[in-house]
Amino acid sequence: MGHGDDLIIADTNFPSDSVARETVLGELLRIDAPAAEVVKAVLSVYPLDTFVEDSAGRMEVVGEPNSILPVMSEVQSEVSAVGGPNPMISIERYAFYERAKKAYAVIQTGERRFYGCFAFRKGVIGPEEN
């Protein structure tokens, strides 16, 4: 997984298995935890791309693109904690599916709340400091 690759973190309702088969990895990864916990863990080792404005995105509520649900707020807090974009971009449902199919991998979480689906674009890891 390199600079510019996408990682999808999805809720239990997302068609993760079928979408994951179309990704670079080709298989689904699972972490049975709430979305915000998974995002926090991932972002502790996965830098967000600072060269683009869409390095962090959320699936938008159908018909309500500006609606921010609690799960989205929780994940936004984790993104903001690592200096990521605030707010995350809103991605229309079917556009999100298409972005997910082109991703490196999909992680399905144990998140049962609706619209707990997020896309993250990988940045670069700098050299070790001496």
Language-model features, listed with the residues they occupy:
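Long, hydrophobic N-terminal alpha-helical segment
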Residues: 1-31
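Generic secondary-structure signature for well-ordered alpha-helical cores
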Residues: 3, 40-51, 77-84, 123
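Ordered, amphipathic secondary-structure segments that act as subunit-interaction surfaces
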Residues: 44-75
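Catalytic cores of large soluble enzymes that bind and process phosphate-bearing ligands
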Residues: 27-34, 60-67, 110
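Membrane-targeting and insertion segments and their boundary/processing signals
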Residues: 9-16, 42-45, 88, 92
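A phosphate-binding glycine/aspartate-rich beta-alpha loop in the early core of alpha/beta enzymes
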Residues: 19-52
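Glycine-rich, aromatic-bearing surface loops/beta-hairpins
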Residues: 63-130
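Structural motif
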Residues: 5-8, 28, 49-59, 86-88, ...
